[in-house]
Amino acid sequence: MTTPTKALKDLYELFASIDSPKESAMLLHDILTPQELEAVAERWQLIQVLASGMTQREAAKACKVSISKITRGSHELQYGSGGFLFFLKKLKKKVARYG
């Protein structure tokens, strides 16, 4: 199913209207299933570990996940839109690699 452009714009505006971590939590708990929320949280943790300078194998071991999950995160850091690096820097997270 292809998401219409208007629907995506509406979603972007929705996220842009968030003013606090509390509001983020309210929205994410309503918009995602518990499993989806856990998957998104896990992905963000993996991105932070990778950006901190760990190798993919070290990150997989530290996070207790498969190397394929780590590889996907690494690929997004290297070749994605730049959103992960932008927000890592905005939140003053350690970025030893990829940026």
What is each of the regions a protein language model found here?
Residues 1-16:
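General nucleic-acid-binding
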Residues 23-43:
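Short, Lys/Arg-enriched anionic-surface-contact patches
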Residues 40-54:
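Short, amphipathic alpha-helical "recognition" segments used to contact nucleic acids or chromatin
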Residues 58-63:
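Short alpha-helical "recognition helix" segments of helix-turn-helix
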Residues 75-88:
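Short, solvent-exposed alpha-helical "recognition" segments
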Residues 87-99:
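Intrinsically disordered, low-complexity basic tails/linkers immediately adjacent to helix-turn-helix/homeobox/MYB/SANT
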